[in-house]
Amino acid sequence: MSTRERNAPEKLSERCLLVLNHISWVDIFVINARSPATFIAKSEIRDWPFVGWLCTLVGTLYIERGRPSAARKASRAIVEQLGGGALIAVFPEGTTTFGRGLEPFHAALFQPALDADATVQPVALRYLDAAGGHTDAAGYVGETSFLESVWTIVSTRHIVADLNFLGPIAARGETRRSLAEKTEAAIAAALEVPAPESSHSRRRGPGRRAGPPGE
């Protein structure tokens, strides 16, 4: 697997929340190969065989779902890290897809960007085959096991992780809902897929939930 970047800035903003669509467990390694980041994920992932170990290894901040106090504590930790110049990466769909569509973004994950007066950096992620077309080979979706996913990836001759850096969005003056909607629209346009409907009016697909539920 190789990586290709488009429109990448020479340097990301000092306080930067990196926002991506989510396709696979491989995504975190694709990002870390470019810029080491702290990832945000639901606490259950920590106990997933091997995947949890990998996520912890690269640096992941886990959030316990269903516990408002834990969510507030995690949010404060994210704000502190953003203020200290750490790069924070989130997958606000909260699940994986094959990248042929986009799920609604959880607005709650954008609150730390507001509190830290950070910049939101949308990135559209795709996996391409040797001919430059879309491939599902990297997808970790539905009932696919981790071993099945690994085997599909290593047995696919050529996969390119395509990272398209879109226009940054200053959090100042925005709301978490407006940030979610703007990043949804930007990433959907870059992927050439329809922008998702409201998270309150659309059922989620069969992907793997990757983060805490939000609005």
Residue ranges of predicted features:
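N-terminal signal-anchor transmembrane helix
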Residues: 1-33, 190, 198-215
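A transmembrane-helix-recognition feature enriched in membrane-embedded lipid enzymes
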Residues: 1-5, 53-58, 156
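Catalytic core of membrane glycerolipid acyltransferases/transacylases, capturing the structured
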Residues: 14-68
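A cross-family acyltransferase "interaction/gating" segment
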Residues: 50-53, 67, 98-178, 182, ...
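Generic beta-sheet signal
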Residues: 42, 63, 91, 123-126
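Residue-level preference for the first positions of well-ordered beta-strands
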Residues: 15-17, 60, 85-91, 119, ...
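Soluble extracytoplasmic domains of inner/organellar membrane proteins
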Residues: 71, 76-88, 92-110, 114
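Hydrophobic beta-strand scaffold residues
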Residues: 2-3, 39, 62, 88, ...
